[in-house]
Amino acid sequence: MPNEVYDVTIIGGGPIGLFSAFYSGLRSMKTKIIDAEPAVGGKVRYFFPEKIIRDIGGIPAITGENLVANLKQQAETFHPTIVCSERVVDVTKLADGTFQLTSHNGSIHFSKTIVIATGSGTFEVNKLEALHAEDFPFAIHYDVKNIEQFRDKVVVVSGGGNSAIDWAQTLEPIAKKVHLIYRGEDFKAHEESVRELKNSRVEIHIHHEISELIGTNNQLTEITVCCNQTQTTKTIETEALFINHGVKVDLGTMAEWGFKQADFGIVVDDEMKTTVPGIFACGDSATYPRKIRIIAAGLHEGPIAINSAKKYLEPTAADEAMISTHHESFIG
């Protein structure tokens, strides 16, 4: 039904949005997820499907692909409506308090509350635009769907953040050789990841930047790197190049929706309330003092946002859902 009104609409179908949808089901809320991408999963699905995620309690290690699959299966427990390939561009509060959400394609959605779980917004990788990179469309990579294609190959990773280091470590056991190129010296990554990197077989080239791509017939065979301290150059043989130079994020029109924002997201209180009554935020969308930006923390914030939405609709409702082991939905 086009004018159907939902109790809560979750904008963003990444890990936090998916778990929030599961929890809203525990609270018997009619739920919709709207995601801008063709499928749910967020950045984890698109950029880290084969990376190992280790920052969720009780799960020592899981690939991004499997994490998303598990969260999607869990979210579907209570049959939320999931809408993909729609980017919400406008939110208006109607006279009766209902929110009208308008998508980029003109679709209209109605909801009594909204939970924003869009992460840092829509995203686009920073691509290597210079050095005739377009000549090597099959050798330059920004994400990976099948890591096995790099088995026994010489691979170069460029970047100095968590993503670059994670890829270097993920590729190291299967590639013939892995080089890591970083223009700086102090890696912008978790301390333990850096320690493991330095103890691995990955050959690290700090203070170096890629200055030339060499190959024929769309096949990359070598790269030249230049030391930004001495201006000396060296050539590295390679068959594949990973570029991890960050992403461009876009909050779109959210700045116009009326809530307070800061440098790192939408300002919320300890109940995940934004400055607009009825709109809540969680995960990387939200910011507050001493916030921890890991998936596990977002999985905690999602239920808080849902509980606040429930109380907004029903002030006398319980503060939180019955735990799943005692919830009526799971008792025979």
Swiss-Prot record:
The keyword Ubl conjugation does not apply. Binds 1 FAD per subunit. It comes from the Bacteria. SUPFAM superfamilies: FAD/NAD(P)-binding domain. Keywords: FAD, Flavoprotein, NADP, Oxidoreductase. FAD binds at D35, K43, F48, V88, F123, D284, T325. One of its GO terms (molecular function) is ferredoxin-NADP+ reductase activity. Pfam families: Pyr_redox_2 (PF07992). InterPro entries: FAD/NAD-bd_sf (IPR036188), FAD/NAD-binding_dom (IPR023753), Fd--NADP_Rdtase_type_2 (IPR022890), Ferredoxin-NADP_redctase_2 (IPR050097). The keyword Acetylation does not apply. Belongs to the ferredoxin--NADP reductase type 2 family. This is Ferredoxin--NADP reductase 1. It comes from Listeria monocytogenes serovar 1/2a (strain ATCC BAA-679 / EGD-e).
